[in-house]
Amino acid sequence: MKISKSLWSVMISILFYLTSAPPFVICSSLEVTIDNHSPSNLKTKGSLEQDKLSHQMINSIKLHGILLWVSMGFLMPVGILFIRMANKAHENGIKVKVFFYLHVIFQILAVVLATIGAILSLRTLENSFDNNHQRLGLALYAAMWLQFLTGVFKPSRGSKRRLRWFLLHWILGTIVSIVGIVNIYTGIQAYQKKTSLSRDSSLWTILFTVQVTCLVFFYLYQDKWEHFQKQRVVLDELDHQNNNTNGRNNQSIQVVTRNDHEQKVMVPQPCRKSNALVNLFKLI
């Protein structure tokens, strides 16, 4: 798919703004002017400034987590669901186009939000890359852009490179989506260790687990949707056959009932008195 010049210009302008903008969190200078204040007042002022900085840092961590949650935890998996739904709706050309463009839009939004989250992390947070969350996040960021570029520069249909491109795009997309979800869990754990807010981290873990469960359920459901439709057709045919069989059985039962009725209404034959000896001699 060829990306239009307007789309490229929008993305380049966004990235240029993000890289050239001032930091998201501007820390005030820590210089203290010594005047007639007492040492206790200076200590109180320093502690308040440290608390303010800590509060700003926590807000930056939360914003970073929300951006990456929406990007890799929601938009990217939903975009994968859209492209799979497009493959299922191959008989309807309109649905294929709608699902395909939804896939493209969701993936572009995911890349933009992940880029904002990465820049926020590099400019305002401590990035020593001494833990698994930061290392995995850096690798994911590189893989995500590689995946995006493979989606942009894809070969035309019928090309010899089409199969290799498809395998690369599919494998990268699957890995980035799964590892991105795992890294969100590691990010929640890192947030708990850094801020000691176990209540917030537990709530976020529960909410994210519920969301992932819903996405997995919908993925499995749409994957078996065609099978469910075929099973419903088979069941309808069986019900129709059973109804026809029951109808034929009812007709035969009515015939038998009519014959019995005819036997019942037959003209009775006149009977005569006889004894056992007469019957015995007739048999002999």
UniProtKB/Swiss-Prot annotation:
Residue positions binding heme b 1: H64, H133
Domain Cytochrome b561: 28-229
GO molecular function, one term: metal ion binding
Cofactors that this protein relies on: heme b
GO annotation, cellular component aspect: membrane
Ligand binding (heme b 2): H103, H169
PANTHER family: CYTOCHROME B561 DOMAIN-CONTAINING PROTEIN (PTHR15422:SF42), OS05G0565100 PROTEIN (PTHR15422)
Designated name of the protein: Cytochrome b561 domain-containing protein At4g18260
